[in-house]
Amino acid sequence: MSVKIAPSILSADFAELGAGVEAIATADYVHFDVMDGCFVPNISIGIPVLQSIRKRTALPIDVHLMIVQPERYVDQFCDAGADLVTCHVEADTPEKIHLALDKIHAKGKKAGVVLKPNTRAEAVLPFLDKCDIVLVMTVEPGFGGQKFIPTTVSRVA
């Protein structure tokens, strides 16, 4: 297993976003957190910011959708420059999550699912055949700068 570094653009100074993207030029990916205020209590960035970042970097962009009904938006995020899109298994019905993963792959992008810290690991099983990645959250989704939850480490192995 290799380690990949994907700094979150959510931590950037948005007045200096271009400089923030350039500062992570040696990373493996750019992690792009999307929050809708419904699935998580916070609202973050969206498609126009992704389009701007795509113009500033050749790095793969990993879009983490913390939104309800992700299948409604995956095409737009893929078209805006995402290389990898992940959806939370808790964000919709299994059928709709399957649909989101299918749409992502139909756009020629990598797809994956995400688990909140307290979601049972088995929740990913119905989706594994369509996943290029499984992201296990080590903090509660929705806010940057949180403390790491040590008990999540055992779920990753």
What are these regions (language model features)?
Residues 1-86, 91-99, 103-113, 122-131, ...:
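Conserved N-terminal beta1-alpha1 strand-loop-helix module at the mouth
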